[in-house]
C-alpha cells in the first residue's frame, strides 16, 4: 500500500524535530520537569491530569469517580459524556437507558465512529443490533474514571470503529479491605433502583468484588416499562510486582419503545388519528376500534401498528476478560489480555396487513410453509453472536525513549433473523403464533476478523520538558456476510457469500507536549485513522450481490492546544481541524459492470470540521474556598465537502452537529459532608437534513444535586449518604435525538421532562 505524501511529510517533520531537539547543542539547562500537580482542592475538583489532560499530547479529558457518583443512580456512562467538551449527547430518557434513543456526535464524527474500551477491552461496534454499546457493560459505582479523546485517542488503544475519538472506561480494582456498599433509589416515573457491592478483601494476594444492580420503572412517554438486571465481578491475584485480573459482566435488559415523531406531529398539525401531539406523543396503551380497510380482516387498518405491545426490545450480554500484567527486569513491562463475549436478544415491530399481504404473495409460491396474514403481523428480529480476542503490549524504557508495541486479534461472529408471524385473531394484543410465519426477511451470519498492531516511541528531551510521541498502527479487517440478507434473497432462492477486506498498514500518529514552565504546557498532534464501515451488515444487505462494497472511511486529525495550571484554577484550550474521506451514502445508481440500477451504499466524498474547545475549573479565594466553578465551551463547524447524486450539499452543515456547546456548573460546600451543585448545558440549533432545509431550535437544561452525609457513619456503617438529583429543573420542552434525512423533514425524540431522584446509600 502506497504511503501518501502527507504521511511522509508528517513523519519526516517528526523525525527532524526529534533529531534536532535531541542534539547536544539543544541540551538547555532547565530545572523544570513536568507540570506541577493541581493545587485546587475540593470534593468535586478533579486533578489536572483528569480535568485538562496534563502531559497528554492530545486533547484528553476525563470524568472522575466523584462526578460519576454524583449523577443520578443508574445513569449510563455514555450519557455522562455530555459533561465533556465537544460531545453532543442526546438521550430519550434522563438516564440514557433506551438504546435506540441515544446519539453522540463530536467534531466530525457520530456514535458509530467513536471507539469505546472497557478496561482496555475493545468494545467493537456500537450498533444496537449485534454491537456492544458501552452502556450495557458497566455500572457507574464500579468505575474509577472515564477518559475521552475527542480528536485522537492513543495509537495503542485497539479499535476498528474509531476515526479518531476514543472513550475509555476504567473500573476500580478490588478493595483490599472487606466491606461493601448498598444503595436504593426512587424517582420519577416509578423508577426504583437497587445497587449492592461486596468487596472480599485481600487474602494472600487475592482480592475481588461482586456487584449487582436492579432497575425497574415506567416509560416517561407512553405506556410500558423498563427492566434491567446487571451483574459485575472482578478477581485479582497479585504475583510479586505483577497481577492477574479476571472480570465478568452480565446484563439483562428489556423495554418497550416510544416513537420518533416529526415536527408536524410534535406541533399537532399532522392530523394524527388519535389526537396526539407534543413531547408526550406516544404509542397507544389500548387497542382502538378502527374502520376495516380490507373486507373480512378485522385488524387490517394500518393504524393498529400504534399499539405499544408491538414495540419491544430485549438484550442479554455476557463479557469475560482476563489480563496479566508484569514487569520484566527493570525496564520492560508486559501486558497480555484475552476476552470473550456472547450476546442474544430480540426486537418486536409491527407490520400492517396490506404490507404483509404483498410480501406474502411475493414469497408463498417459492417458500413452503408460509401462512396468509390474519391482520396485524408480529415482526420478530433475533440476534445472537460471539466476540473473542486477545491483546498484547510490551513497553521498554530505554534512556530518553519509552518504546511500546502491541497487537490485537479479534473474531466477531454475528447471526440475525427477521420474520413476520401471525397473531391470534390477527389482533395487536393477540399472542404471537410463531408456528405461522407469513413471510421471511433475513437469516444471515456475518463475521469480522481483525488484526491490528502498533509501534510507538515517546521521547523525553530538554530535561524532560519536551515529550514527543511518534507511532503508527496497522489495521486489517476481513468481513464476510452470507445467507439470506433481504427478502429478495429468499425470492431468488439465493444465499450469497460476500467478502471484503479493508486495511491500511501505515496509520501514523505524531504528538508533542512542551512544558513552558512548571504551570503551563503547549501540545499538538496529528493522526490518521481508518474504520470498519459503520453499519456494514446494512450496507451489504441493501442491494443485490452484484453491488460493490464501499471503501473504508478514513480520517485525519490535527490539534494544537495550551494548558494552564494555577493555585486557584486550571484550564485547557485546543484548536482542531478534522476531516474524513469516503463518507458512506445510499442512493440509486447503475451497478458497475451492468445496466441495472439499484440503491446501494457508495463512497461520496468528505466531511471537514474545525473549531475550538475550552475546559476549565476555578476555585476563587475570595469565596472562602467553599465555592468552585467548572465550564466547557465548544465551537464546531462541520460541513460536507462534496455533492452526491442530484443533491447539492457541498458546503452544507452536517445535520445534528451544533455550532455551540456549553456546559457549566457551580459547586458549593457550606459545611463538611454537604455538597450542592447547580449545572447547565446549552446546545445551539442543529440542522436536521443534508440540504439544511430544516433545523431544530437550541435549548438549555439546568440540573442540580445535593449530597449529604459524606464522612458520616453510624452503627455498622462507615458512611451513610443521601443524595437528591433534579434533572431539567425548568422542565424545558425540546427535541433531542434526531434521525437525520437527506432532503425531507427529520424525525425526533422529545427530550425527557423534569425528573427527581432520591438515593440513600450505606457503606460498611
What spans do the regions from the language model cover?
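C-terminal beta-signal and adjacent terminal beta-strands/loops
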Residues: 4, 530, 576, 581-582, ...
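A beta-strand signature from Gram-negative outer-membrane beta-barrel systems
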Residues: 36, 137-181
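N-terminal periplasmic "start-of-domain" segments of outer-membrane beta-barrel proteins
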Residues: 37-72, 103, 126, 148
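Extracytoplasmic beta-strand/coil segments of soluble accessory domains associated
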Residues: 78-122
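Short acidic/polar hinge/loop motifs at secondary-structure boundaries
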Residues: 104, 122-150, 170, 264-266, ...
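Short strand-turn segments of transmembrane beta-barrel domains in outer membranes
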Residues: 150, 165-200, 210-222, 679
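Acidic/polar loop-and-plug regions of large Gram-negative outer-membrane beta-barrel proteins
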Residues: 236, 243-321, 348-379, 431-434
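Gram-negative outer-membrane beta-barrel transporters
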Residues: 400, 461-465, 568-570, 575-580, ...
Amino acid at each position: 500500500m502506497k504511503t501518501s505524501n502527507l504521511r511522509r511529510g508528517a513523519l519526516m517533520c517528526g523525525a527532524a524535530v526529534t533529531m534536532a531537539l535531541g542534539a547536544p547543542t539543544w541540551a538547555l539547562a532547565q530545572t523544570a520537569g513536568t507540570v506541577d500537580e493541581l493545587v485546587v482542592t475540593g470534593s468535586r475538583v478533579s486533578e489536572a491530569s483528569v480535568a485538562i489532560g496534563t502531559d497528554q499530547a492530545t486533547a484528553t479529558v476525563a470524568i472522575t469517580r466523584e462526578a460519576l457518583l454524583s449523577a443520578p443512580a443508574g445513569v449510563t456512562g455514555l450519557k455522562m459524556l455530555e459533561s465533556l467538551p465537544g460531545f453532543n449527547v442526546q438521550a430519550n430518557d434522563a438516564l440514557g437507558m433506551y438504546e435506540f434513543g441515544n446519539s453522540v456526535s463530536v467534531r466530525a464524527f457520530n456514535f458509530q465512529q467513536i471507539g469505546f474500551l472497557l478496561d482496555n477491552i475493545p468494545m467493537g461496534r456500537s450498533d444496537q443490533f449485534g454491537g456492544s454499546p458501552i452502556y450495557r457493560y458497566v455500572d457507574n459505582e464500579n468505575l474509577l474514571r472515564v477518559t475521552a479523546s475527542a480528536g485522537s485517542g492513543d495509537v495503542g488503544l485497539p479499535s476498528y470503529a474509531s476515526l479518531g475519538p476514543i472513550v475509555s472506561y476504567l473500573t476500580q480494582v478490588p478493595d483490599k479491605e472487606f466491606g461493601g456498599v448498598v444503595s436504593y433509589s426512587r424517582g420519577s416515573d416509578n423508577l426504583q433502583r437497587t445497587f449492592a457491592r461486596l468487596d472480599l478483601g485481600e487474602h494472600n494476594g487475592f482480592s475481588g468484588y461482586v456487584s449487582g444492580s436492579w432497575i425497574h420503572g415506567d416509560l416517561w412517554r407512553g405506556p410500558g416499562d423498563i427492566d434491567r438486571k446487571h451483574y459485575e465481578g472482578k478477581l485479582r491475584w497479585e504475583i510479586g510486582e505483577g497481577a492477574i485480573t479476571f472480570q465478568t459482566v452480565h446484563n439483562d435488559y428489556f423495554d418497550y419503545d416510544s416513537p420518533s415523531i416529526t415536527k408536524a406531529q410534535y406541533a399537532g398539525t399532522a392530523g394524527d388519528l388519535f389526537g396526539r401531539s407534543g413531547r408526550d406523543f406516544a404509542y397507544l396503551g389500548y387497542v382502538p376500534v378502527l374502520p376495516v380497510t380490507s373486507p373480512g380482516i378485522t385488524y387490517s387498518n394500518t393504524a393498529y401498528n400504534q399499539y405499544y405491545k408491538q414495540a419491544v426490545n430485549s438484550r442479554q450480554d455476557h463479557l469475560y476478560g482476563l489480563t496479566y500484567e508484569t514487569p520484566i527486569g527493570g525496564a520492560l513491562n508486559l501486558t497480555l489480555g484475552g476476552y470473550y463475549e456472547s450476546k442474544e436478544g430480540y426486537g418486536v415491530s409491527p407490520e400492517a396487513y396490506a404490507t404483509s399481504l404483498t410480501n406474502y404473495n411475493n414469497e408463498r409460491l417459492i417458500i413452503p410453509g408460509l401462512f396468509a396474514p390474519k391482520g396485524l403481523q408480529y415482526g420478530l428480529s433475533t440476534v445472537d453472536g460471539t466476540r473473542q480476542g486477545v491483546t498484547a503490549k510490551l513497553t521498554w524504557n530505554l534512556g530518553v525513549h519509552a518504546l511500546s508495541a502491541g497487537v490485537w486479534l479479534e473474531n466477531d461472529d454475528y447471526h440475525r433473523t427477521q420474520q413476520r408471524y401471525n397473531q391470534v385473531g390477527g389482533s395487536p394484543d393477540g399472542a404471537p403464533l410463531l408456528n405461522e410465519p407469513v413471510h421471511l426477511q433475513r437469516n444471515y451470519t456475518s463475521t469480522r476478523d481483525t488484526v491490528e498492531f502498533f509501534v510507538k516511541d515517546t521521547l523525553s528531551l530538554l530535561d524532560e520538558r519536551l515529550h514527543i510521541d511518534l507511532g503508527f498502527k496497522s489495521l486489517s479487517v476481513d468481513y464476510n456476510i452470507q445467507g439470506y440478507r433481504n427478502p429478495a434473497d429468499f425470492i431468488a432462492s439465493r444465499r450469497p457469500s460476500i467478502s471484503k477486506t479493508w486495511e491500511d498498514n501505515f496509520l501514523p500518529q505524531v504528538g508533542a507536549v512542551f512544558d513552558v514552565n512548571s504551570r503551563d504546557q503547549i501540545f499538538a498532534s496529528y493522526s490518521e485513522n481508518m474504520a470498519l464501515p459503520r453499519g456494514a451488515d446494512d450496507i451489504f444487505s441493501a442491494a443485490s450481490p452484484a453491488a460493490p462494497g464501499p471503501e473504508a472511511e478514513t480520517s485525519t486529525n490535527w490539534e494544537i492546544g495550551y494548558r494552564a495550571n494555577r493555585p486557584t484554577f486550571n484550564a485547557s484550550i485546543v484548536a482542531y481541524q478534522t476531516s474524513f474521506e469516503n463518507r458512506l451514502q445510499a442512493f440509486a445508481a447503475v451497478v458497475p459492470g451492468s445496466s441495472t440500477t439499484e440503491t446501494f451504499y457508495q463512497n461520496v466524498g468528505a466531511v471537514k470540521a474545525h473549531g475550538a474547545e475550552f475546559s476549565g475549573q476555578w476555585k476563587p479565594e475570595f469565596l472562602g474556598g467553599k465555592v468552585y466553578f467548572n465550564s466547557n465551551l465548544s465551537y464546531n463547524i462541520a460541513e460536507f465537502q462534496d455533492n452526491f447524486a442530484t443533491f447539492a450539499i457541498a458546503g452544507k452543515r452536517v445535520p445534528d452537529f451544533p455550532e455551540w456547546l456549553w456546559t457549566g456548573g457551580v459547586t458549593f460546600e457550606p459545611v463538611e459532608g454537604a455538597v450542592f451543585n447547580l449545572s447547565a448545558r446549552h446546545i445551539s440549533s442543529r440542522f436536521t437534513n443534508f440540504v439544511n432545509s430544516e433545523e431544530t431550535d437550541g435549548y438549555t437544561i439546568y440540573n442540580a444535586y445535593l449530597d449529604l452525609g459524606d464522612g458520616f457513619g453510624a452503627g455498622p456503617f462507615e458512611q451513610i449518604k443521601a443524595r437528591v438529583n433534579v434533572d431539567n429543573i425548568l422542565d424545558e420542552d425540546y427535541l433531542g435525538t434526531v434521525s437525520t434525512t437527506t432532503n425531507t423533514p427529520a424525525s425526533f425524540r422529545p427530550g425527557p421532562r423534569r425528573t427527581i431522584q432520591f438515593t440513600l446509600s450505606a457503606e460498611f
